[in-house]
Amino acid sequence: MEFKLQELNLTNQDTGPYGITVSDKGKVWITQHKANMISCINLDGKITEYPLPTPDAKVMCLTISSDGEVWFTENAANKIGRITKKGIIKEYTLPNPDSAPYGITEGPNGDIWFTEMNGNRIGRITDDGKIREYELPNKGSYPSFITLGSDNALWFTENQNNAIGRITESGDITEFKIPTPASGPVGITKGNDDALWFVEIIGNKIGRITPLGEITEFKIPTPNARPHAITAGAGIDLWFTEWGANKIGRLTSNNIIEEYPIQIKSGEPHGICFDGETIWFAMECDKIGKLTLIKDNME
Protein backbone atom coordinates (compact mmCIF):
# COMPACT_ATOMS: atom_id res chain seq x y z
CA MET A 1 0.00 0.00 0.00
CA GLU A 2 1.07 3.58 -0.64
CA PHE A 3 0.03 6.50 1.54
CA LYS A 4 0.09 10.25 1.14
CA LEU A 5 1.42 12.13 4.16
CA GLN A 6 0.24 15.68 4.80
CA GLU A 7 1.04 18.07 7.62
CA LEU A 8 -1.39 20.81 8.64
CA ASN A 9 -0.30 23.94 10.48
CA LEU A 10 -2.24 25.16 13.49
CA THR A 11 -3.21 28.79 14.05
CA ASN A 12 -0.80 29.49 16.92
CA GLN A 13 2.74 28.45 17.78
CA ASP A 14 4.05 26.52 20.79
CA THR A 15 0.63 25.11 21.69
CA GLY A 16 1.71 21.50 22.34
CA PRO A 17 -0.76 19.31 20.38
CA TYR A 18 -1.04 16.03 22.25
CA GLY A 19 -4.30 14.05 22.25
CA ILE A 20 -6.44 13.65 19.14
CA THR A 21 -9.77 12.09 18.18
CA VAL A 22 -12.33 12.34 15.37
CA SER A 23 -16.10 12.65 15.71
CA ASP A 24 -18.53 10.59 13.65
CA LYS A 25 -19.16 13.78 11.65
CA GLY A 26 -15.50 14.05 10.68
CA LYS A 27 -14.47 16.86 13.02
CA VAL A 28 -10.94 16.50 14.40
CA TRP A 29 -10.48 17.41 18.06
CA ILE A 30 -7.06 17.97 19.65
CA THR A 31 -5.69 18.89 23.06
CA GLN A 32 -2.99 21.56 23.28
CA HIS A 33 -1.41 21.34 26.71
CA LYS A 34 1.00 24.26 26.33
CA ALA A 35 -1.73 26.64 25.13
CA ASN A 36 -4.20 25.31 27.73
CA MET A 37 -6.96 24.73 25.21
CA ILE A 38 -8.77 22.28 22.98
CA SER A 39 -9.25 22.90 19.27
CA CYS A 40 -11.67 21.51 16.71
CA ILE A 41 -10.82 21.32 13.00
CA ASN A 42 -14.01 21.38 10.93
CA LEU A 43 -14.47 19.69 7.56
CA ASP A 44 -13.68 22.95 5.77
CA GLY A 45 -10.42 23.30 7.70
CA LYS A 46 -11.67 26.08 9.96
CA ILE A 47 -10.30 25.83 13.49
CA THR A 48 -12.38 26.63 16.57
CA GLU A 49 -10.50 27.06 19.84
CA TYR A 50 -11.81 26.37 23.34
CA PRO A 51 -9.58 27.94 26.05
CA LEU A 52 -9.90 26.15 29.38
CA PRO A 53 -11.22 28.02 32.44
CA THR A 54 -8.52 26.61 34.74
CA PRO A 55 -5.02 28.04 34.05
CA ASP A 56 -2.16 25.61 33.34
CA ALA A 57 -4.48 22.61 33.45
CA LYS A 58 -2.13 20.48 31.29
CA VAL A 59 -4.91 18.98 29.20
CA MET A 60 -3.81 15.57 27.92
CA CYS A 61 -6.15 12.98 26.41
CA LEU A 62 -9.70 13.26 25.13
CA THR A 63 -12.60 11.16 23.89
CA ILE A 64 -15.96 11.80 22.25
CA SER A 65 -18.96 10.21 23.95
CA SER A 66 -21.75 8.46 22.09
CA ASP A 67 -23.94 11.55 22.56
CA GLY A 68 -21.35 13.78 20.88
CA GLU A 69 -19.75 15.50 23.87
CA VAL A 70 -15.99 15.89 24.25
CA TRP A 71 -14.48 14.68 27.53
CA PHE A 72 -10.85 15.27 28.49
CA THR A 73 -8.32 14.99 31.30
CA GLU A 74 -6.69 17.96 33.03
CA ASN A 75 -3.54 16.32 34.33
CA ALA A 76 -2.16 19.20 36.42
CA ALA A 77 -5.50 20.71 37.44
CA ASN A 78 -6.73 17.37 38.81
CA LYS A 79 -9.98 17.66 36.89
CA ILE A 80 -12.08 15.97 34.23
CA GLY A 81 -13.32 18.39 31.61
CA ARG A 82 -16.23 18.33 29.22
CA ILE A 83 -17.33 20.36 26.19
CA THR A 84 -21.06 20.11 25.61
CA LYS A 85 -22.66 20.09 22.17
CA LYS A 86 -23.40 23.79 22.72
CA GLY A 87 -19.69 24.49 23.26
CA ILE A 88 -19.94 25.04 27.01
CA ILE A 89 -16.97 23.85 29.07
CA LYS A 90 -17.62 22.12 32.39
CA GLU A 91 -14.99 20.89 34.84
CA TYR A 92 -15.18 18.31 37.63
CA THR A 93 -12.57 18.20 40.40
CA LEU A 94 -11.40 14.74 41.45
CA PRO A 95 -11.96 13.66 45.07
CA ASN A 96 -8.26 13.18 45.86
CA PRO A 97 -5.56 15.82 45.22
CA ASP A 98 -2.74 15.37 42.70
CA SER A 99 -4.33 12.31 41.07
CA ALA A 100 -2.99 13.31 37.62
CA PRO A 101 -5.82 12.06 35.38
CA TYR A 102 -4.55 10.98 31.97
CA GLY A 103 -6.24 8.38 29.72
CA ILE A 104 -9.98 8.61 29.07
CA THR A 105 -12.68 6.65 27.23
CA GLU A 106 -16.40 5.90 27.30
CA GLY A 107 -17.63 2.76 29.02
CA PRO A 108 -20.38 0.37 27.88
CA ASN A 109 -23.21 2.21 29.66
CA GLY A 110 -22.21 5.78 28.80
CA ASP A 111 -20.11 6.56 31.87
CA ILE A 112 -16.69 8.08 31.18
CA TRP A 113 -13.72 6.14 32.54
CA PHE A 114 -10.24 7.54 33.14
CA THR A 115 -6.87 6.71 34.66
CA GLU A 116 -5.15 8.46 37.55
CA MET A 117 -1.38 8.26 37.10
CA ASN A 118 -0.35 9.57 40.51
CA GLY A 119 -3.50 8.46 42.28
CA ASN A 120 -2.97 4.84 41.20
CA ARG A 121 -6.67 4.52 40.54
CA ILE A 122 -9.19 4.05 37.77
CA GLY A 123 -12.02 6.56 37.88
CA ARG A 124 -15.44 6.86 36.32
CA ILE A 125 -17.72 9.86 36.02
CA THR A 126 -21.42 9.85 35.26
CA ASP A 127 -23.29 12.29 33.06
CA ASP A 128 -24.35 14.29 36.13
CA GLY A 129 -20.75 14.59 37.36
CA LYS A 130 -20.65 11.95 40.08
CA ILE A 131 -17.19 10.38 40.40
CA ARG A 132 -16.23 6.95 41.69
CA GLU A 133 -12.69 5.63 42.02
CA TYR A 134 -11.13 2.16 42.17
CA GLU A 135 -7.74 1.54 43.79
CA LEU A 136 -5.25 -0.58 41.84
CA PRO A 137 -3.76 -3.64 43.59
CA ASN A 138 -0.11 -2.58 43.25
CA LYS A 139 1.29 0.75 44.39
CA GLY A 140 2.89 3.03 41.81
CA SER A 141 1.38 1.25 38.80
CA TYR A 142 1.06 4.55 36.89
CA PRO A 143 -2.03 3.70 34.82
CA SER A 144 -1.87 5.44 31.45
CA PHE A 145 -4.19 4.93 28.47
CA ILE A 146 -7.57 3.20 28.78
CA THR A 147 -10.00 1.74 26.24
CA LEU A 148 -13.22 -0.26 26.06
CA GLY A 149 -12.72 -3.90 25.14
CA SER A 150 -14.91 -6.26 23.13
CA ASP A 151 -15.87 -7.94 26.43
CA ASN A 152 -17.38 -4.66 27.73
CA ALA A 153 -14.61 -4.34 30.31
CA LEU A 154 -12.19 -1.41 30.45
CA TRP A 155 -8.57 -2.23 29.60
CA PHE A 156 -5.63 -0.03 30.55
CA THR A 157 -1.85 0.05 30.62
CA GLU A 158 0.12 0.06 33.87
CA ASN A 159 3.27 1.86 32.79
CA GLN A 160 5.36 1.27 35.93
CA ASN A 161 3.89 -2.11 36.87
CA ASN A 162 4.68 -3.62 33.44
CA ALA A 163 1.16 -4.95 33.12
CA ILE A 164 -2.13 -4.63 31.30
CA GLY A 165 -5.09 -4.07 33.59
CA ARG A 166 -8.75 -4.95 33.17
CA ILE A 167 -11.64 -3.56 35.20
CA THR A 168 -15.29 -4.56 34.96
CA GLU A 169 -18.35 -2.36 35.42
CA SER A 170 -18.61 -3.70 38.97
CA GLY A 171 -15.01 -2.72 39.75
CA ASP A 172 -13.30 -6.13 39.64
CA ILE A 173 -9.67 -5.69 38.58
CA THR A 174 -7.38 -8.23 36.90
CA GLU A 175 -3.75 -7.65 35.89
CA PHE A 176 -1.72 -9.41 33.21
CA LYS A 177 2.07 -9.19 33.29
CA ILE A 178 3.85 -8.34 30.03
CA PRO A 179 6.56 -10.87 29.02
CA THR A 180 9.19 -8.20 28.25
CA PRO A 181 10.57 -6.82 31.54
CA ALA A 182 10.19 -3.08 32.22
CA SER A 183 8.50 -2.57 28.84
CA GLY A 184 6.72 0.66 29.81
CA PRO A 185 3.28 0.17 28.21
CA VAL A 186 1.50 3.41 27.29
CA GLY A 187 -1.12 3.48 24.51
CA ILE A 188 -3.83 0.83 24.19
CA THR A 189 -6.75 0.31 21.80
CA LYS A 190 -9.29 -2.31 20.81
CA GLY A 191 -8.37 -3.90 17.50
CA ASN A 192 -10.84 -4.94 14.84
CA ASP A 193 -9.94 -8.54 15.73
CA ASP A 194 -11.49 -7.91 19.18
CA ALA A 195 -8.12 -8.22 20.92
CA LEU A 196 -6.48 -5.33 22.77
CA TRP A 197 -3.33 -3.83 21.26
CA PHE A 198 -0.77 -1.76 23.16
CA VAL A 199 2.63 -0.13 22.71
CA GLU A 200 5.75 -0.61 24.82
CA ILE A 201 7.63 2.70 24.91
CA ILE A 202 10.72 1.14 26.53
CA GLY A 203 10.37 -2.43 25.26
CA ASN A 204 10.14 -1.06 21.68
CA LYS A 205 7.37 -3.48 20.81
CA ILE A 206 3.72 -3.68 19.90
CA GLY A 207 1.73 -6.01 22.13
CA ARG A 208 -1.50 -7.91 21.62
CA ILE A 209 -3.60 -9.30 24.46
CA THR A 210 -6.72 -11.39 24.03
CA PRO A 211 -9.74 -11.01 26.33
CA LEU A 212 -8.44 -14.16 28.05
CA GLY A 213 -5.10 -12.53 28.80
CA GLU A 214 -2.83 -14.22 26.22
CA ILE A 215 -0.07 -11.82 25.14
CA THR A 216 1.94 -11.73 21.89
CA GLU A 217 4.63 -9.15 21.12
CA PHE A 218 6.02 -7.72 17.87
CA LYS A 219 9.39 -5.95 17.71
CA ILE A 220 9.55 -2.53 16.04
CA PRO A 221 12.32 -2.40 13.37
CA THR A 222 13.71 1.01 14.41
CA PRO A 223 15.62 0.89 17.72
CA ASN A 224 14.44 3.26 20.46
CA ALA A 225 11.36 4.25 18.45
CA ARG A 226 9.53 5.04 21.70
CA PRO A 227 6.00 4.18 20.53
CA HIS A 228 3.40 6.26 22.32
CA ALA A 229 -0.19 5.85 21.11
CA ILE A 230 -2.00 3.27 18.97
CA THR A 231 -5.27 3.02 17.05
CA ALA A 232 -7.09 0.47 14.90
CA GLY A 233 -7.10 1.22 11.16
CA ALA A 234 -8.75 -0.39 8.16
CA GLY A 235 -9.17 -4.16 8.25
CA ILE A 236 -7.07 -5.43 11.13
CA ASP A 237 -4.22 -2.96 10.66
CA LEU A 238 -2.89 -1.14 13.72
CA TRP A 239 -1.30 2.30 13.49
CA PHE A 240 0.96 3.86 16.10
CA THR A 241 3.15 6.89 16.71
CA GLU A 242 6.91 6.55 17.11
CA TRP A 243 7.73 9.54 19.26
CA GLY A 244 11.46 8.78 19.42
CA ALA A 245 11.96 7.83 15.76
CA ASN A 246 9.77 10.59 14.28
CA LYS A 247 7.76 8.04 12.34
CA ILE A 248 4.28 6.57 12.06
CA GLY A 249 4.16 2.78 12.29
CA ARG A 250 1.71 0.29 10.82
CA LEU A 251 1.31 -3.34 11.85
CA THR A 252 -0.25 -5.18 8.93
CA SER A 253 -2.56 -8.19 8.85
CA ASN A 254 0.43 -10.50 8.28
CA ASN A 255 2.22 -9.10 11.35
CA ILE A 256 4.74 -7.03 9.39
CA ILE A 257 5.60 -3.58 10.71
CA GLU A 258 5.97 -0.79 8.17
CA GLU A 259 7.23 2.67 9.09
CA TYR A 260 6.56 6.05 7.49
CA PRO A 261 8.98 8.92 8.27
CA ILE A 262 7.44 12.25 9.20
CA GLN A 263 8.57 15.05 6.89
CA ILE A 264 9.37 17.68 9.49
CA LYS A 265 12.30 17.03 11.83
CA SER A 266 11.49 16.52 15.50
CA GLY A 267 7.74 16.32 14.90
CA GLU A 268 7.23 14.49 18.21
CA PRO A 269 4.08 12.56 17.27
CA HIS A 270 1.84 11.64 20.19
CA GLY A 271 -1.91 10.94 19.84
CA ILE A 272 -3.28 9.05 16.83
CA CYS A 273 -6.76 8.14 15.54
CA PHE A 274 -8.58 6.82 12.44
CA ASP A 275 -11.77 8.20 10.89
CA GLY A 276 -12.51 5.31 8.52
CA GLU A 277 -10.41 6.73 5.70
CA THR A 278 -7.57 8.80 7.15
CA ILE A 279 -5.05 8.35 9.94
CA TRP A 280 -4.71 11.54 11.99
CA PHE A 281 -1.95 12.27 14.49
CA ALA A 282 -0.95 15.16 16.73
CA MET A 283 2.61 16.51 16.79
CA GLU A 284 4.15 18.64 19.51
CA CYS A 285 5.70 20.82 16.78
CA ASP A 286 2.31 22.53 16.27
CA LYS A 287 1.23 20.42 13.33
CA ILE A 288 -1.47 17.83 12.70
CA GLY A 289 -0.50 14.96 10.43
CA LYS A 290 -2.71 12.87 8.17
CA LEU A 291 -1.99 9.70 6.22
CA THR A 292 -4.34 8.81 3.36
CA LEU A 293 -4.28 5.66 1.22
CA ILE A 294 -3.53 6.54 -2.41
CA LYS A 295 -2.72 3.12 -3.84
CA ASP A 296 -3.47 -0.43 -2.80
CA ASN A 297 -0.74 -2.63 -4.29
CA MET A 298 -2.96 -5.67 -3.82
CA GLU A 299 -5.36 -4.44 -6.51
Swiss-Prot record:
Record InterPro entries: Streptogrm_lyase, Vgb, WD40/YVTN_repeat-like_dom_sf
Binding site for Mg(2+): E268, E284
Keyword terms: Antibiotic resistance, Lyase, Magnesium, Metal-binding, Plasmid
Metal-binding is among the record's keywords: yes
Biological process annotations from GO: antibiotic catabolic process; response to antibiotic
Residues holding substrate: H228
Cofactor(s) for this UniProt protein: Mg(2+)
EC assignment: 4.2.99.-
Domain of life: Bacteria
Active site: H270 (proton acceptor)
Transmembrane segments: none
HAMAP family: VirginiamycinB_lyase
Function, as annotated: Inactivates the type B streptogramin antibiotics by linearizing the lactone ring at the ester linkage, generating a free phenylglycine carboxylate and converting the threonyl moiety into 2-amino-butenoic acid.
Note: Has unequivocally been shown to cleave the ester bond of streptogramin B antibiotics by an elimination reaction and not by hydrolysis, therefore is a lyase and not a hydrolase. The olefinic dehydrobutyrine thus generated in the N-terminal position has a Z stereochemistry.
Quaternary data: Monomer.
Protein name stated in the entry: Virginiamycin B lyase
